[in-house]
Amino acid sequence: MEPDRVGREPQYDLFADEFLDHAADGFYNAHYDRPACLDLLGDVRGKQVLDAACGPGLYAAELVSRGAQVTGFDASPRMVEICRERVPDAEFLVHDLADPLDWLPDGSVDVALCALAIEHVDDRVAALSELRRVLKPGGALVLSRMHPTGDWLRHGGSYFDVRVIRERWNKGWDVTYWLAPLEVTCREIYEAGFLIERLTEPRPVPGAADLNAAEYERLAREPRGFLAFRLLKR
């Protein structure tokens, strides 16, 4: 029987150290998701950036190097420990994306980033609404998530069903997330108070072909990977 909720367990805490090693130069993270999101973030010099569900701080480190003032949070205590060790010039807190950001005042952040995390939240509109609340007028949220077409091709059933998926990744990591059609994600974005400025279906950067030529060719022609959005507070 499929689960009907993702729940609140910090899934990545169990493999936080392994995930750092995997994501630092891994195909999907370093050569696919991060380049796309960093492009959408644009120039962050001097800006207050909120890194929501920051993982091991790979984005935070890059944003600090580009001149941003970064605050990050993650539900995994071990991920936050890793962040504090690796990125001492940023601030990090243990906090669940599903909870209100009650430690941040309204309109206190220039830009927010939420990379490959929103699908692990049961009430995505509430989480996105909180990110909107803390953005300054005209602020932007860069959001990435798994491409629903790729997940649907893997799991079958109706593309239009909204359902919880539990799967084991190739490193033996068990993860649970929401699979929903693109129209549902777009509706949730609008209900949370955002407009879509840009939507990209990223392709891997050219150097990724040296890591995995077959996967590079597949993602260069098929929508099986991620989506990335730049959203404006309305």
Residue positions per predicted region:
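A short SAM/SAH-binding and catalytic strip from SAM-dependent methyltransferases
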Residues: 111-124
